[in-house]
Curated annotation (Swiss-Prot):
It comes from Rickettsia akari (strain Hartford). PANTHER family: ELONGATION FACTOR P, TRANSLATION ELONGATION FACTOR KOW-LIKE DOMAIN-CONTAINING PROTEIN. This is Elongation factor P. GO terms for biological process: peptide biosynthetic process. InterPro entries: Elong-fact-P_C (IPR015365), NA-bd_OB-fold (IPR012340), Rib_uL2_dom2 (IPR014722), Transl_elong_fac_P/YeiP (IPR020599), Transl_elong_KOW-like (IPR013185), Transl_elong_P/YeiP_cen (IPR001059), Transl_elong_P/YeiP_CS (IPR013852), Transl_elongation_fac_P (IPR011768). The keyword Ligase does not apply. The gene is efp. Its main location: cytoplasm. The lineage of its organism: Bacteria, Pseudomonadati, Pseudomonadota, Alphaproteobacteria, Rickettsiales. HAMAP family: EF_P.
Length: 188
């Protein structure tokens, strides 16, 4: 399926020179004073792991890989693999940890994820858009800090660092976006 260069998003898998490339960073849309607008895209080769930056004209069309998507439940880690179970047929598959890279700490036991297959081979795992995590380290609460929009660093139970509002304390649960690792709100 062809998509416009302006439609490229993080996580898209593109076919370039007969290889599969995953968009690993949010594409930058640029319109210089001279010349046409372009999109700067950082991609990673799924076979070799090599990263590269490409610049596409806004009018270019690229081939997006046709992927089959299925729901799987994360069960456990086994060596360098994730063990996932199909939620419909209860079949188990092994998927290399490397597919998730920096998102691996967000994976929790029994989490439902979407696994994308290309020619029946698992290529990508999509996590839920948000997860609820507990704050394990942060500075003490400052009285009267609810009116300000300032943030302080916090370490979550999975070791990820995120900026949180001043009024949050250790032990509180928060909602975090998995795509850009940012604080959303206090968990209800």
């Amino acid at each position: 399926m062809k998509i416009s260069a302006n439609s490229i998003r993080t996580g898209n898998i593109l076919v370039c020179n007969n290889d599969l490339w995953v968009v690993s960073k949010t594409p930058e849309h640029t319109q210089p004073g001279k010349g046409g607008a372009y999109v700067q895209v950082e991609m990673k080769n799924l076979k070799t792991g090599i990263k590269r930056n490409d610049r596409f004209s806004s009018s270019d069309y690229l081939e997006k890989a046709e992927l089959e998507q299925k729901d799987y439940q994360f069960l456990y880690f086994e060596g360098n693999d994730l063990i996932l179970m199909d939620t419909k047929h209860f079949d188990q598959i092994n998927v290399p940890k490397g597919i998730l890279e920096e998102k691996l700490p967000f994976l929790t036991e029994n989490m439902i994820v979407k696994v994308e297959f290309y020619n029946e081979k698992p290529l990508n795992i999509e996590l839920p858009p948000t997860v609820i995590l507990e704050i394990s380290e942060t500075d003490p609460v400052i009285k009267g800090a609810t009116a300000t929009a300032s943030y302080k660093p916090a370490v979550l139970e999975n070791g990820i660092k995120v900026k949180v509002p001043q009024y949050l304390a250790i032990g509180e649960k928060i909602v975090v976006k998995t795509d850009d690792i940012t604080y959303v709100e206090r968990a209800k």
